[in-house]
Amino acid sequence: IFINTKIIAESPENLFWAGIGDAISKELEAQLSIRGHKVSHTPLMGNQLSLICIDPLIEYGKKAYEDCKNNVDSFELEQVVLDIIVTTGLVSNFMTTENDYYYNSSLAHGFYNGTSVIPNCIQHLHGEIVSFGSLVLLTYDKNYDECDRIMAFHKEMGLPLTMADIGLTEEDLPAVAERSSVTKEWTCVPYEVTKEKF
């Protein structure tokens, strides 16, 4: 992999911001989707690697985002870029095969896919919606302490905290749940997921 952080530092900051939002989901989705499965070496390695996805984003994300806004190629920006591209990329590759297993995504991306039927969501970036989907995942999983930690990071980064932040209303939820329920990600949960609860 060749990564030029100077070019990334000069890229549109909203894309960098959304990349952080998308990367937040990797650890959460990997941990949820693999829970309760007896797995072989490769997905087990991906699962362990996923455990270092969120902390660098929380530690360096705010400064890295500010540096990207100012076109500064910094240590913090480099750490976040490596996390987004290398760490999450390796996790994705280790946790997915074409036919044998799929532990790469879960409810955060399922939520994103569900919003694809809502016209107001189209203007929002993939990682922006997935970051809110991470809050949905954590709430559905009743992992409230981690949800509070991620919400604090969202607040610091200006990532979505409410449905309104991504153009959703309560009236949209049945359509989002219906669309989400037919995605592969809907099944990547260690328990039954219902549209009503979702």
Predicted regions and their residues:
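C-terminal intrinsically disordered extensions
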Residues: 35-49, 53, 57-61, 176-198
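A glycine/threonine-rich phosphate-anchoring loop and its flanking beta-alpha core
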Residues: 1-49
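A short secondary-structure junction motif
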Residues: 27, 31-35, 64, 87, ...
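Active-site segments that bind and position negatively charged phosphate/pyrophosphate groups
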Residues: 39-152
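C-terminal charged capping/lid subdomain of soluble metabolic enzymes
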Residues: 143-198
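Generic alpha-helical structural context detector
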Residues: 22-29, 82, 113, 135-136, ...
